[in-house]
Each structure stands twice: as structure tokens, then as C-alpha cells.
């Protein structure tokens, strides 16, 4: 939902969700600034950043907005809560325990030749793996992502089970 929507959680909220499980592809660790002034980004790198913003920034901003509303609603008296259409929506966000871009970089050689040529011509192939992480659906890469998600979810198994049990 976060590709078309600036508020990707909105459809779930407006259809009456009382709990939302949010699964993100961003590890939550901010990117480090380079020690030296970077080269100007290529067209492909700018496109990769645009994809990152479209998918992740909107999701994170919407989740943060919902948590602020939850906090505000929880401060209201029971009488005041009855007068507002706002309600507390339980939320659990699952983030990968590691940045998925290095995983994409490891698998970039498995991209079809035409895709590698296109990405090289756009100046992306030597980059940080951001574009590849969005475009790659090669079986080994997807398997690594599934394994990471599975391990991360097992590490939070009690929290996830409690959330799903309601």
C-alpha cells in the first residue's frame, strides 16, 4: 500500500482495524554520512532513493503519526473518548535486523544480463544495492530475505504471538 499512498496505513484504519502489523524493509539504522564529499548521484541512484522514499518514508511517517494519535487518545478521559471517532490502534512494527542492501549487492550478479546492462548504464551497479533491493526477485535473494524475516520473527516470537492473539 505504501507505493501509491502517502498514508499506507489509512485503508486499514478506515476499514475499522483495531490492530495493525507493519512489516518494513528498512532496518531502522540511519545511513552514515560519507567521510568525504560524495560524487553527484547518477540518475539510477536518484531513482533508487525515490523508491526508498516512496516505500519506506511514507510507511514510517504514517506509523509515527498513528502512534502520536494513539498517545493523544490514551490521555483522554473515557467520556472524551466516546465523543471522538479516534481510537487507539494496537501496532507492531517488524523491521529486519540488518540492512537488506548488502544482501542485494551479494546477489546482483544473478540479475538477468539485460537488467545488469541497464543498471550499469544508469550508474547503479557499483552503488550500495538500494536499487537492486527493489528490483531483484531472483530466487536466492528472495530466499535470503525470507530466512532473515523468519529468524527476526522467531527472535520476537513471544511479542508477535501476543500481538496476534490480541
Task: Walk through the language-model features, giving the residues of each.
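Patatin-like phospholipase
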Residues: 1-166
